[in-house]
Amino acid sequence: MTGLPDGVDRALRVLAAVALERRQAYDALDAATGDGDFGSTFARGAAAVVRARPDDLRTAGLAFAAAAGGSSGALLGAALVRLDGRGLSDGSDAGAVAAALLDADAAVAELGGAALGDKTLRDALHPAAEALADGDVPAAITAARSAAEASAGLTARRGRSAYAGERSVGAVDPGAVAVADVLEAWVAGEPPTWEALLDRVGEAAADDAEDDRVDRAVDGLVAAHPTLRRLPGVRAVVRADSGAGPGGEPRVVLVSGGGAGHEPLHAGFVGAGMLDAACPGAVFTSPSSAQVLAAAEAVDQGAGVLFVVKGYTGDVLNFGLAAQSLTPASATVLVADDVATAVDDGPGRRGTGATVAVEKLAGALAAEGADLESCRAFGQAVADDARSYGIAFRGEEMEQGVGIHGEPGRPLEPRRHGSALAHALCEPLLAEVDPGAPLLVLLSGLGGTALLDLRRRTPTWPRCSPGRAARSSAAWSATW
């Protein structure tokens, strides 16, 4: 038992049991249009709650968010924190439970910005809470399940599934399904004990080596580079030296991060003239706000912290929460450069390749001793002027506009070669930038293209647009 009221203790055990049991099923649902990690994120947060066995919901929420990462970790953690102190007891008062669920729904809406109909867990949580307010538990469960099934007919407008646009229609939202599953389990019978749940956490950890793989990779990076160190107890890589300003004075420091699986981004760019700290999340999952906060506090020199954040919901949420909790002055550069996701009713463009340019150029300015606002303004100008576009190859077919986590792009088409491929890459980009501006061209294989192939394609840029090529300041090709 915990120090929580019996009903709340039971509800937490129900939540944890569902998350641990259905991890793979939720991942599979999420993979249909997203990056396939909702179940893993949900289970990771639940496992942290089981290990903590908290005496209040605030502690439960903070533990969940710190371990889970991603947008789901931040949102569900915030919902648990919001419920703390509501006076919930044995869970038999349907009206009190309904009010609590509506409050949790409001917390998710405020932090994540999702409206009803955006194809998120709110689409099941809100109608279930409203039905429960009338004291009708079966109606609440039916409302949640019906809403979860109906989410298949919605177009996603929040989270990574939103980048699939109309192709998200036909797939249910895993968060909405999870809400229905939890409510059904809530009335189905007694959930496992904390001891039994802890055994399940251990079994899951033995079966799933993902977190261990990321931690070992971080340790390997640090072991290979004595200029780096890992923060004790935190998955964060920082510079081993202080890296003070030109005259030894404090300077602005840069902190970034993102899901593992995109190496060398971001930890590979920790060093002089670039990042001072990087926070790797789980594979394809943004780091938690706790990671980001610890990294920022570790490297702060007193001149301010500049966060470089990619335009993904989880990154924006977790870096934003860290900035709110950070005592030193901070500022944020938001990178949103992917033209394939520039739609009016979506979550905004994804942040991709331009992140490397921002980290390098803003990092160089910080190393010269520029103040926080100058570094922010310059970094944001670089980000605002940048555009990127991705193409993936599948045998003799290719997919334009694909995301870095495998988010679907345009329908498959015959593979192009030579100048035809260069035009496919360049046309969406040239339409978005100032015709007379000098250009910095970055060609990245994202770890999936041999450097030999990247380098041989770099000269195709002049054939793509001769007039533009004359104004190219530089062309870089590598794996970023």
Regions of interest found by a model, annotated:
Residues M1-W480:
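N-terminal loops that bind phosphate or other acidic moieties
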